UniProtKB/Swiss-Prot annotation:
<feature type="binding site">
    <location>
        <position position="233"/>
    </location>
    <ligand>
        <name>NAD(+)</name>
    </ligand>
</feature>
<feature type="binding site">
    <location>
        <position position="198"/>
    </location>
    <ligand>
        <name>substrate</name>
    </ligand>
</feature>
<dbReference type="InterPro" id="IPR042172">
    <property type="entry name" value="Adenosylhomocyst_ase-like_sf"/>
</dbReference>
<dbReference type="InterPro" id="IPR015878">
    <property type="entry name" value="Ado_hCys_hydrolase_NAD-bd"/>
</dbReference>
<keyword id="KW-0378">Hydrolase</keyword>
<dbReference type="GO" id="GO:0006730">
    <property type="term" value="P:one-carbon metabolic process"/>
</dbReference>
<feature type="binding site">
    <location>
        <position position="386"/>
    </location>
    <ligand>
        <name>NAD(+)</name>
    </ligand>
</feature>
<feature type="binding site">
    <location>
        <begin position="199"/>
        <end position="201"/>
    </location>
    <ligand>
        <name>NAD(+)</name>
    </ligand>
</feature>
<dbReference type="InterPro" id="IPR020082">
    <property type="entry name" value="S-Ado-L-homoCys_hydrolase_CS"/>
</dbReference>
<dbReference type="GO" id="GO:0005829">
    <property type="term" value="C:cytosol"/>
</dbReference>
<comment type="similarity">
    <text>Belongs to the adenosylhomocysteinase family.</text>
</comment>
<dbReference type="Pfam" id="PF00670">
    <property type="entry name" value="AdoHcyase_NAD"/>
</dbReference>
<dbReference type="GO" id="GO:0004013">
    <property type="term" value="F:adenosylhomocysteinase activity"/>
</dbReference>
<feature type="binding site">
    <location>
        <position position="232"/>
    </location>
    <ligand>
        <name>substrate</name>
    </ligand>
</feature>
<dbReference type="InterPro" id="IPR036291">
    <property type="entry name" value="NAD(P)-bd_dom_sf"/>
</dbReference>
<dbReference type="Pfam" id="PF05221">
    <property type="entry name" value="AdoHcyase"/>
</dbReference>
<feature type="binding site">
    <location>
        <position position="320"/>
    </location>
    <ligand>
        <name>NAD(+)</name>
    </ligand>
</feature>
């Protein structure tokens, strides 16, 4: 059960007594997050985020705590919630709450609480002072959608009928928020200078809204910064996926057959993760380019219908829906392990198993028994396995992602008038800056171009070194 502080109700955490433990781990993480620490040193005195009120929706982990404290060190005020019901690290949330930042996050929170907490991070008003959020930092798009749909409802529009429990709770929370604070979300949307979005799924939502001409403020697509997608998505998953599967099941990967659905950056890292553990890896793909990449990396590319007959472990990494169906799971081997490393829980038809016998082995590990007696293991109920069953990506790779997020927030706050209501990526020179900030920690020494060499290839001596269309 969540506990509240005696002197304030402006946070919800599992146990505020975990704050000291959280602070110790935050201190360690700071030594592995050179990009964020460099931004504190560079911008701390100038306070470029002074006056910014950031509504943040992103996994409440130790690494996110370092991001939050970087934003506040640069002058921002922050209200924070997690973006996944299983991803919170309770000691991290406690440490941030104890520092005075309003945070609403409990590992294993209900969907009802999740959406109520999204409402809490938008409620900036104190004593009817009229304050609202003026920036959003999002992961998956839930906070952005809450604000946009809130403004639409206040304008008299209606939402489509909910199709699942998630949508039921979102609509309930929105209506409750509007009833308590009518007109406030409309005012909020007008005040927002922009949103920076962390992940592939959220970026897809933003592009969809922008294509319809309905995006009311600029958005920065952090996910497609090279120092995010080619590092967090690839190298992060390469380390965190097998960590989660092993913590959840104690399975020996060596010799097993594993299937990865999707061979984008996350799928590439996941497939390498499993292969490095000794598994024989199959890949499913819809895209001929990604399928060819997988084949030339030595992976066997098959359909899911074939994979279910052969595999012991299944990982979805597509960002799509119904990738593993109830029929697929019914055809799997006894004690097959099924999990997802995409942002939402739509990739595996978990709801279709609701009427079968579920046995919780431990938190985020369930045995599901089919009518014929066969069982499969479901991790994190089909939600993000690396954050549900483990602690997510290592601090170092998250430093690159969160340095991008911080730079995006500075860009939106200080230069928003230079952006239209569209989706942008950070300029190449900032992408290269993020990479450069992480080299010393690894002992990397860059070669410097001479002026003659720079002229020869047509780039500045100090960069940027690649055109925007270059594919790393």
């Amino acid at each position: 059960m969540a506990t509240l502080a005696a002197d304030t109700r402006d946070y919800v955490v599992a146990d505020i007594g975990l704050a000291d433990f959280g602070r110790k781990e935050i201190n360690i993480a700071e030594t592995e997050m050179p990009g964020l620490m460099a931004l504190r040193a560079e911008y701390g005195a100038s306070q470029p985020l002074k006056g910014a009120r950031i509504t943040g929706s992103l996994h409440m982990t130790i690494q996110t705590a370092v991001l939050i404290e970087t934003l506040t060190a640069l002058g921002a005020e922050v209200r924070w919630a997690t973006c996944n019901i299983f991803s919170t690290q309770n000691h991290a949330a406690a440490a941030i709450a104890a520092s005075g930042v309003p945070v609403f996050a409990v590992k294993g929170e209900s969907l009802a609480d999740y959406w109520d907490y999204v409402g809490r991070i938008f409620d900036w008003e104190s004593d009817n002072d009229g304050r609202t959020a003026n920036l959003i930092l999002d992961d998956g798009g839930d906070a952005t959608m809450f604000a946009l749909w809130g403004a639409k409802l206040e304008a008299g529009e209606t939402m489509p009928p909910p199709e699942n429990e998630e949508e039921v709770e979102m609509q309930r929370a929105l209506k409750a928020f509007i009833a308590a604070k009518p007109g406030y979300l409309t005012k909020t949307v007008k005040a927002i200078k922009g949103v920076s979005e962390e992940t592939t799924t959220g970026v897809h939502r933003l592009y969809h809204i922008a294509k319809k001409g309905e995006l009311p403020f600029p958005a920065i697509n952090v996910n497609d910064s090279v120092t995010k997608s080619k590092f967090d998505n690839l190298y992060g998953c390469k380390e965190s996926l097998v960590d989660a599967i092993r913590r959840g099941t104690d399975v020996m990967l060596a010799g097993k057959v594993a299937t990865v659905a999707g061979f984008g950056d996350v799928g590439k890292g996941s497939a390498q993760s499993l292969r490095n553990g000794g598994a024989r890896v199959l890949v499913t793909e819809i895209d001929p380019i990604c399928a060819l990449q997988a084949a030339m990396e030595g992976f066997e590319v098959v359909t899911m219908d074939e994979a279910v007959k052969r595999s012991d472990i299944f990982v979805t990494a597509t960002g799509n829906a119904d990738v593993i169906t109830a029929e697929h799971m019914a055809a799997m081997k006894n004690m097959a392990i099924v999990c997802n490393i995409g942002h939402f829980d739509s990739e595996i038809q978990i709801a279709a198993l609701a009427n079968y016998k579920w046995t919780e082995v431990k938190p985020q590990v369930d045995l599901v028994e089919f009518p014929d007696g066969k069982q499969i293991i479901i991790l994190s109920k089909g939600r993000l396995v690396n954050l549900g069953n483990a602690t997510g990506h290592p601090s170092f790779v998250m430093s690159a992602s969160f340095t991008n997020q911080t730079l995006a927030q500075i860009e939106l706050w200080t230069r928003s008038e230079q952006y239209q209501n569209d989706v942008y990526v950070l300029p190449k020179h900032l992408d290269e800056k993020v990479a450069a900030l992480h080299l010393e920690k690894l002992g990397v020494k860059l070669t410097k171009l001479t002026q003659k060499q720079a002229d020869y290839i047509g780039v500045p001596v100090e960069g940027p070194f690649k055109p925007d269309h270059y594919r790393y």
